[in-house]
Amino acid sequence: MASRRKSTTPCMVLASEQDPDLELISDLDEGPPVLTPVENTRAESISSDEEVHESVDSDNQQNKKVEGGYECKYCTFQTPDLNMFTFHVDSEHPNVVLNSSYVCVECNFLTKRYDALSEHNLKYHPGEENFKLTMVKRNNQTIFEQTINDLTFDGSFIKEENAEQAESTEVSSSGISISKTPIMKMMKNKVENKRIAVHHNSVEDVPEEKENEIKPDREEIVENPSSSASESNTSTSIVNRIHPSTASTVVTPAAVLPGLAQVITAVSAQQNSNLIPKVLIPVNSIPTYNAALDNNPLLLNTYNKFPYPTMSEITVLSAQAKYTEEQIKIWFSAQRLKHGVSWTPEEVEEARRKQFNGTVHTVPQTITVIPTHISTGSNGLPSILQTCQIVGQPGLVLTQVAGTNTLPVTAPIALTVAGVPSQNNIQKSQVPAAQPTAETKPATAAVPTSQSVKHETALVNPDSFGIRAKKTKEQLAELKVSYLKNQFPHDSEIIRLMKITGLTKGEIKKWFSDTRYNQRNSKSNQCLHLNNDSSTTIIIDSSDETTESPTVGTAQPKQSWNPFPDFTPQKFKEKTAEQLRVLQASFLNSSVLTDEELNRLRAQTKLTRREIDAWFTEKKKSKALKEEKMEIDESNAGSSKEEAGETSPGDESGAPKSGSTGKICKKTPEQLHMLKSAFVRTQWPSPEEYDKLAKESGLARTDIVSWFGDTRYAWKNGNLKWYYYYQSANSSSMNGLSSLRKRGRGRPKGRGRGRPRGRPRGSKRINNWDRGPSLIKFKTGTAILKDYYLKHKFLNEQDLDELVNKSHMGYEQVREWFAERQRRSELGIELFEENEEEDEVIDDQEEDEEETDDSDTWEPPRHVKRKLSKSDD
């Protein structure tokens, strides 16, 4: 970037002739007290000396003719053409200023010499110290415009003090934190005495200025133009006045050593903004700016969250802060101007999406710095370890300058990173800390000494980048062992696991929660309450497993906590054995839950009101179901004697008992018929309908709820073949499940599963239950397409979606079916095959029956038969 340079050594040496555009002033010994960056291959730091030797303007440098041309001092470039030489200097060495002039805007005073400008200031502006120089390039000429700044920090912008005089007044609250302003650049020349200049460059320009791609037309240089400086060997230069009790953090993006990729900066965003050095922006130039809004905590908090509020947010702020929307808009615009915030609409939207995910929004850079809490170390310097995501090249340097009461100290951090942003393990970075020097010694470059503090680890948290870290085998082993002991770990157990595994509390609790969820939803738990001797596999968060991970552990399920067979484990999924004992004791005392009892249970079990109330409700339903089953068992016991004579001993021996297990988890065809009929009526039954289904089918309410959820999912994905059969059928004509039974596979009344030798395979004895129609034909997908084809004779694309939904076929299947009909019509053959639909109905019904039930046939329970026989009589 273009800048100025003052040096006692000429930058450009002319061989023999003078350039008329370059004014040579050899009798000057001093130049302006400004230091600007120069190209250097060494890492540079900040230092100064009160003994200032102001030098000749860089635009008035001596040039030495070499073999009839011009030679560049900073490289081997030589040319006899002055224009080419000037172009080379501007393009390759933008820090070198040629052909400069000085203008006092207040007095319209123009001069080529800085000392003449200083004499003008002493004569016409006595006692004035708040000058500001603005560099402007016009017509291949650099002009420094001097203005008088009205807004101050109760003093100058840059104040030079001795090390013992580092005390100063507090920074004005109207200033802006450096952490939100363009980076302050402070550099020095190789071997010369220096002064400090503050260059306002946006943060976004830092990567680009490395390649010299952007050259701004204007650059502000803030300086203290006092020409007299006290000479001392024990002096230092302090930027902006550092608060006496503050360890301020400023940023120094310096040139790096060869081979290093880039220099990045890190400034904590959590430091008190009032204690950080400020950069002033004159807001009095905004006509309608209301300074009273600067002290409004609501607006400040809103701006700190996001600098671009929406119109709705501005309306809310206007109502809360009692200011007009226009004033609030102008205030936010001024704050963004002060802080150097200028985002494109796309960047604003992206930042709005990312403002809650833990990342700091900036224009895309090489590194995203995530602010973390800065803790003060034993040496008084703030810790400068911060979490950052490496998205560029490896081998970067994180540089930070921490200002204390005595000296500003730099502490570079060398990050040794593999350069892959999604890697699991970020290597540790060692932090050599510079030891502050309290004695009054000449302040040279603050270079880290050989002494180093205890090495700290900068471990990147992958969750901050939206990456879920894979747990190691050792971590998973510890978690599994703890899970087998207790699925709901106490705080002490979590703390122990945190120490052993190194995981955070949130990660451990989430792993336990996910594991409990996976175990509850595993297929082996469907009959857990019925098969006491079965083992249950614990599904351990499969996303944490790697290919080399050992197999998951198994454990015998504990059945003592679930004494009621009608309840699935899901109803007690979050309750411990102690909680269940308390609830059980309360239910035995009284099944009616009063408010006093509810409050007592809440305090004792730590459960919510809704959980306790739901448990009591399910308990009452379970009790009612048990009583109904007892009545059914009694009726079955009474009717068994009446039917004993109808069953031969051989057949009875071959018939399995109704209480036998083996397929007890399967739903009977009658139960499936009830559920399917209810699903066709409504996919989202009300609680009363769930209770009614549970009472009619004899299934647990949770099983019914689970079945409806699975069926809704299958319906959404188009996997229900029976839905349209039930939808188009007249449910009143379906007595039991006669329409779903296979033809010729029924069993005579009262007989076992065996078949007498003399009886044909297809014959059966018809009873009262089987008097309904043996087969009901429903329209299949092709039947719906056939009706549409007979009506329209072609496929209309507008009706394609409706046909797909009604026929339950895919888009390509529907199109192929109509294409086949068109082909048959052109060939003059039969459009539709005979008996096509009847075969499809029968096949689909048989496939559905085979998928949903393994039993060969189904007969109604005995108490239902008895009731039907009595009604017939």
UniProtKB/Swiss-Prot annotation:
Residues 223-236 have a biased composition (Low complexity). Residues 272-432 are annotated as: Required for dimerization. Coiled coil: none annotated. A zinc finger (C2H2-type) spans 70-93, 102-125. Keywords: DNA-binding, Homeobox, Isopeptide bond, Metal-binding, Nucleus, Phosphoprotein, Repeat, Repressor, Transcription, Transcription regulation, Ubl conjugation, Zinc, Zinc-finger. This is Zinc fingers and homeoboxes protein 1. One of its GO terms (cellular component) is nucleus. There is a cross-link at residues 159, 441, 454, 485, 629 (Glycyl lysine isopeptide (Lys-Gly) (interchain with G-Cter in SUMO2)). Belongs to the ZHX family. Residues 734-768 are annotated as: Required for nuclear localization. GO terms for biological process: negative regulation of transcription by RNA polymerase II; regulation of transcription by RNA polymerase II. Residues 272-564 are annotated as: Required for interaction with NFYA. Residues 284-346, 464-526, 569-630, 660-722, 777-832 bind DNA. It is found in: Nucleus. Acts as a transcriptional repressor. Increases DNMT3B-mediated repressive transcriptional activity when DNMT3B is tethered to DNA. May link molecule between DNMT3B and other co-repressor proteins. Forms homodimers. Heterodimer (via HD1 domain) with ZHX2 (via HD1 domain). Also forms a heterodimer with ZHX3 which is a prerequisite for repressor activity. Interacts with ATF7IP and NFYA. Interacts (via homeobox domains) with DNMT3B (via PWWP domain). Residues 212-221 have a biased composition (Basic and acidic residues). The lineage of its organism: Eukaryota, Metazoa, Chordata, Craniata, Vertebrata.
